[in-house]
Amino acid sequence: MLGWVVTFLVIALIAGILGFGGVAGASIEIAKIIFFIAIVLFLVSAVVGLARGRTRV
């Protein structure tokens, strides 16, 4: 549990530095692209999982 706290703290610090440093405007487009790629990969994974007939617990 402590590991998760440290991980999210580091992520929050990096996001704060980038957000207040003016880099946020440039990274919004990259974040959008990564978001849509993640959605596509999720959908492909779901379709392949359903096609194979596996049940996930």
Swiss-Prot record:
It is a multi-pass membrane protein. It comes from the Bacteria. Its main location: membrane. It is found in: Cell membrane. InterPro entries: DUF1328. Keywords: Cell membrane, Membrane, Transmembrane, Transmembrane helix. One of its GO terms (cellular component) is plasma membrane. The chain crosses the membrane at residues 1-21, 30-50. Belongs to the UPF0391 family. This is UPF0391 membrane protein BRADO5617. It comes from Bradyrhizobium sp. (strain ORS 278).
